[in-house]
Amino acid sequence: MPASAKDAPSWVLDPVHTRVMFAVSHAGFSQALGTVSGSTGTLVFDPDDWARTRLDATVPLERVDLGDPSWNRAALAQRLLDTQAHPLARFTSESAIPTDDGQASVCGELTLRGGTRPLCMDVTVNAVKRHPMPPFRRTAGFSATAVLSRSHFGIVAWPSVIGDEVTIRIEAEAVRSRLAEPEPEQEQEPGALQ
């Protein structure tokens, strides 16, 4: 690990509260919307020093949901995502450059369908604080957006029906690594005293 990230706080992505959403043109009529749940990964992050940020995240593509079973099967099939051969997408960051208060451009490499290409995300920190619900873990919340070309990853089928530009939106939460975080003081769950 680079020296700049060595002593920064370490976090683990919360797969329950992390969601990848995407939008792509459906023959010019509308934007087809999909989601992917269950992402996992590790994060090194200090809100006071973006340069120390390191992210390694994995997205389980078999959980793509376009809201329709037939669409889902088509998206996962060999001509598009080919999840049988490439079940995971992975993003590893290489740099994080602050752009505004609580915001940064996080750039790295995205591996998708066997191809690896550079990708930059615009990231906003929503909150860094102890979660109000048990087990009261210190939690960081983020929103991020990015745009990619599906053809850059070899996904070229049905160009007259599916647009090439894919807009990505991510809502993510990460909790402090248990090894890095001291045990919180005991707190009552809301309603416990009633």
Label the model's feature ranges.
Residues 1-194:
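Low-complexity, acidic/polar, glycine-enriched regions of mature
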